[in-house]
Amino acid sequence: AVLQMTAHGLVAGAMFLLVGLLYERTHTRNILDYSSLVRVMPRFALFMTITLFAAMGLPGTVGFIAELHAIIGGFQEWGNLMILLGMSILIGTAYAMRTIGMLFTGPVKPQMRDIEDLKLYELVAAGVLVVAIVLFGLWPTPLINLSTATMSQMSDIISQSIQ
């Protein structure tokens, strides 16, 4: 659960930041107003795609590690019910792929031709989150060790207070 919360914080934080930066430039929330942003905002497109891949639970991202641990832990407790609950991952994946397709493919719409790509300070802010998403996806050991140690200490504190 700690891994899932950490992954969610990183992915949701990056997604809200990137969507906010896009809205700041375009002043529209309608996804139908966008297309082929990869041509006019390539850095934004890269960061948003990695973030959406993490939301899907793609291997190599923190989303995969978190979902894998949640499914394995849940399967040990609830068995085949987790297979049914795993369908939500497929629904989320379909949503993310549709979002990628609508934002980054098709012809460039005239009103989107002059959108400015991410500025340096925006790159740094989004980059920190995206690097953490990938780093913890490729090397989750520090995060797992930290959460294991913390949970062990919490368990000791609770068991001592019960006695």
Predicted regions and their residues:
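Interfacial and helix-entry/exit segments of alpha-helical transmembrane bundles
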Residues: 9-92, 111-132
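The feature identifies polytopic integral membrane transport proteins across all domains of life
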Residues: 1-2
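Cytoplasmic/organellar membrane-interface segments at the starts of transmembrane helices
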Residues: 41-43, 97-163
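Long, well-ordered mid-to-C-terminal structural blocks that present hydrophobic/aromatic surfaces
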Residues: 5-6
